[in-house]
Amino acid sequence: MRVPININNALARVRDPLSIGGLKFPTTKEIQEAVAAIADKFNQENDLVDRFFPEDSTFASELELYLLRTQDAEQTGMTFVHQVGSTSLPVEARVAKVDLAKATWSPLAFKESRVWDEKEILYLGRLADEVQAGVINEQIAESLTWLMARMRNRRRWLTWQVMRTGRITIQPNDPYNPNGLKYVIDYGVTDIELPLPQKFDAKDGNGNSAVDPIQYFRDLIKAATYFPDRRPVAIIVGPGFDEVLADNTFVQKYVEYEKGWVVGQNTVQPPREVYRQAALDIFKRYTGLEVMVYDKTYRDQDGSVKYWIPVGELIVLNQSTGPVGRFVYTAHVAGQRNGKVVYATGPYLTVKDHLQDDPPYYAIIAGFHGLPQLSGYNTEDFSFHRFKWLKYANNVQSYLPPFPPKVEL
């Protein structure tokens, strides 16, 4: 995605731009002006997860989270995300402070940069003057868009991980964890995994489905009759959910009753897409659940493409479809003014100018400090039932086309 940004306009408004030879690179102030155009574009592309974790900020150095388990000291801490060639920020080992069911945690810090090294600078210097500005313009615009997109993906990863697992877990072998640190925050989500021994796509020797998806959710709703905090109101599914419904023999009976379409018999059959939609509509009406389909993908560090919500999994929302918490940005050092340290919150983009050093380089650094924070815990026992996780099928991938290798979607 390329965002049309004219860096030259920003440069023209600044009296003394950074320069080396005939090259002109933007300053932090100019970068921030250019970023405003990108930020507006990203704000118009709200993701589904933003609905459940609206952004917030605080200057507190720690966030209070409600937990049911004490975390070991060695589990605290997480590497700062960065690309090869960028400098890692120092990591502070901190013991979790536990008071009954509450705990405070230092926010996670993420940082990476786009670096123009000496080789690239020399290459740009060999370009004609009328070409240099256009090339630098294009590289800066693409880098800003790329860095901001990666920050949004990191935020999405944190929030989806909380909603899928009830915790944030960074393993030493994580491809984004070059320092090999281990980080675990358990949010104490009560019984997050719903039991389903036999999946919706399981069938017996006669080809009959083992579980009725509609009845399964109707039973969940009935069991929550006297526990409104546990009543399902919606589900968030990845790709393939409608395929599983269409192949479930229990759902096929509903379709046969309403539409007269009999699977496997010599009758007029609708296209597969029409049948899938009919099965999904029937599921919605008979369960009363809102079905949110989220089939977006991201590319992992190793080049593989993954779904944010893995195939065969879904998230059950209880009580309402409103926010389940906030994504809180915490303070970071934003520079110095009149000899005093300046603090700010939210994502940041700054310039690191070392064009006069040996070897020279120029970098745009992007990052943020923050964590998801849940709300809606029971005030008496700190139980939390706003969302649950369900593994509903084993063979959904067979319905989907394989991802081409190392393709960014």
UniProtKB/Swiss-Prot annotation:
InterPro entries on file: Major_capsid_GpE
Primary location: virion
Keywords for this protein: Capsid protein, Host cytoplasm, T=7 icosahedral capsid protein, Virion
GO CC, any one term: host cell cytoplasm
Subunit structure, as described in the record: Homomultimer. Interacts with the portal protein. Interacts with the decoration protein.
Family: Belongs to the lambda phage major capsid protein family.
Primary role: Assembles to form an icosahedric capsid shell with a T=7 symmetry although with a diameter of about 82 nm, which is a larger volume than the usual T=7 capsids. A dramatic reconfiguration of the capsid shell that expands the procaspid from a diameter of 66 nm to a supersized capsid of 82 nm, allows packaging of the large viral DNA genome. The capsid decoration protein binds the expanded capsid and stabilizes it.
Name this polypeptide is given: Major capsid protein
Protein source organism: Thermus virus P23-45 (Thermus thermophilus phage P23-45)
